[in-house]
Amino acid sequence: MKLALISPKGVGMGTNEENRWTEELYDSLSGIDSLRELMSCANSPLLTVASILESFFDEMEYIDEEIEDIDWEKQYDMVAMSFMTQQASRAFEIAGQFNEKGVYLIAGGMHPTNSPDETLQYFDTVFVGEGEITLPQFMNDYLENKPLRIYKNTHEINMDEVPLPRYDLLKMDRYRTIPLQISRGCPHNCEFCASTKVYGPKYRHKSVDRVMQEIEMIQKIKPNSHIYFTDDNMLVKKDFAIELLDALKDKKL
């Protein structure tokens, strides 16, 4: 089977044609190249999904609409998307086109978790919350021709047990900034933030050794790359933050 992991372009994100105002903002500011690169960063959750599902598929392809177009001539058995609200309208458009081809569609991430009913109008299966446990459950159901329409995570995921992202799927020559998630959850439950709704109020983080392992892997795959910590709040635990920063300093990072 062949799986496409698609990161949809979004309003106000990246450097695609629809975001000309973003380009104008970049051009109006000096020394802003790092912001441009950051906004064109790869989709970290999808790379983790690829690791979780790799044993179920013969072939996987990661497609980032911020750097390339979808090749509608290619054939896939399944399409997976992870997206935020500013990407939702485009995600639904993509889903509609693949639906016409009879491709099975699955979705997760911030928007599907917070708006599952809306997302189910366009996708065959929606994942609410973290997918490390529910994704393999879904695949087993799918292979037995009895997939559910919605899977909700009810377990607390140990961050050190999260599979290493499939960075090897990236077209590395198109990226300078590589994403790295080291924690999930936040105790503050701010009204403007969806983090607690997706990951819960308990702050969970990878060990410093695990973080450094991932950084070393990124450096081997993409030397001299920028690393973007995608965490919603990586400074919740002061002792951990200091330990991590000391480790980064020791490695001259």
Model-identified regions with their sequence ranges:
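Radical SAM [4Fe-4S] cluster-binding motif and immediate context
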Residues: D160-L253
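A cross-family glycoside hydrolase active-site/sugar-binding cleft signature
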Residues: I6, S82, I106-G108, Q181, ...
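Flexible loop residues that form catalytic
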Residues: P8-V11, M84, G131, V198, ...
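Short, glycine/serine-rich, charged loops/turns that create anion-binding
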Residues: G10-G12, I67, P112, N233-M234
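Glycine-rich beta-alpha loop elements in corrinoid/cobalamin-binding modules
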Residues: P45-E161
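Aromatic-acidic/polar surface patches that form glycan- and anion
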Residues: L38-A42, L46, Q87, R204, ...
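Short glycine-rich His-centered loop
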Residues: L3-L38
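Beta-sheet entry/capping signal
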Residues: K2-L3, T125, S225-I227
